[in-house]
Regions:
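Active-site recognition of the HExxH zinc-binding catalytic motif
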Residues: 147, 184-197, 207, 211, ...
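Sec-exported extracytoplasmic/periplasmic mature domains
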Residues: 40-47, 57-65, 115-119, 191-199, ...
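A metal-dependent hydrolase signature that marks the N-terminal structural subdomain at the beginning
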Residues: 70-161, 168-171, 301-304, 310-326
């Protein structure tokens, strides 16, 4: 334990992020004699703190002690996907939630993206299943993201109902609407997973932080052929629409609503996501202000709000990504 504390102290002094220290010529974790001597002299006050630290610094600078700073976490796990049957779907098989998921290839694509860009210390399952209610969550005990088929069904039904006066438009646009909101929901739960797996030191409500991560990920979505980022902006527009519709269909009764809940009200999440979209690209999203969806008083700070959010997540994940935020 004394040895670990000594090495840790030296590392902190030099400001080096260390995941692995290897000494030339030493194998199988054998502690070399020079470390024992140096540590012993320091522990016995035969040398002062400065001499001890300078000795470690010399070994690092001269290459005798090799420091691997390429990774601070080993990539020992992956996100992986499991589909469970969807026998109780209210729709025919080809229109079921599981069929939508599999045909869209959404989860497969995003899981590949995550595994390419982030290092996990262990596996995290993404489970698509029937839950008995419309929901999605991250299970901290078993390290599992759950996407419920009922959530997809509910999104479909609410969207069609909300646009019942123009069903042609509703049926034409419902699939991308569901896709975008499912994508955002998935990344929201991934945000929870990353906070847990990496033990990220967040401040504020975790639900809000997960909302920010999901919105940030969608804002990065672009057309690989043209480099057009408007795709991500349109996806955020659909997510905002999702919360707007939910607010309209499920009005809040102050006497019944659980204001103690960790989630913001749907209308608050609508304004937050609209702000993130505007902040990431004010010119493209000027219509949010022009059409009265985003008040100018909030929009004034949205660019800074987005940059703070981006810097925060970049800093939090700098030791765990493969250069995604570089």
């Amino acid at each position: 334990m004394k040895l670990v504390l000594i090495i840790a102290m030296a590392v902190v002094v030099f400001g080096i992020s260390v995941s692995l220290i290897s000494v030339q010529g030493q194998q199988n974790n054998v502690i070399p004699q020079w470390i024992k001597n140096n540590a012993g002299w320091w522990a016995d006050d035969s040398i002062d703190d400065e001499s001890f630290v300078n000795g470690i610094k010399y070994l690092i600078d001269s290459g005798i002690m090799e420091i691997n700073i390429d990774t601070t976490i080993q990539d020992q796990g992956d996100f992986y996907l499991t589909y469970k049957p969807n026998p109780n779907s209210p729709y025919v098989e080809e229109d079921s939630a599981i069929a939508f998921l599999k045909n869209s290839n959404l989860l497969e694509q995003e899981i590949n993206f995550l595994n390419e860009n982030f290092r996990l210390p262990y596996d995290v399952e993404v489970l698509a299943q029937e839950c008995g209610n419309a929901n999605a969550w991250y299970d901290y005990e078993i390290k599992q993201i759950v996407i419920c088929y009922e959530l997809i069904d509910m999104d479909y039904e609410n969207y069609i109902y909300f646009h019942n006066e123009d069903l042609d438009y509703a049926y034409e646009t419902v699939d991308p609407y569901i896709y975008d909101n499912l994508d955002w929901t998935f990344f929201h739960e991934v945000g929870h997973a990353l906070i847990d797996v990496y033990q990220l030191p967040i401040t504020g409500l975790e639900e809000n932080v997960a909302d920010q991560f999901a919105s940030l990920m969608l804002s990065y979505t672009y057309d690989e052929n043209t480099g057009d980022y408007s795709i991500g902006q349109d996806m955020l527009y659909n997510v905002g629409t999702w919360f707007w519709i939910s607010n309209e269909l499920y009005s809040v009764n102050p006497d019944d609503y659980p204001f103690w809940d960790t989630h913001n009200l749907d209308i608050q999440r609508f304004y937050n996501i609209s702000c993130y979209a505007y902040g990431s690209d004010p010119q493209y999203n000027q219509d949010l202000i022009d059409e009265g969806y985003l008040p100018e008083d909030r929009a004034y700070w949205c660019e800074e709000e987005y940059l703070v959010m981006e810097r925060a997540w970049s800093f939090l994940l700098k030791d765990f990504d493969n250069g995604f935020f570089d």
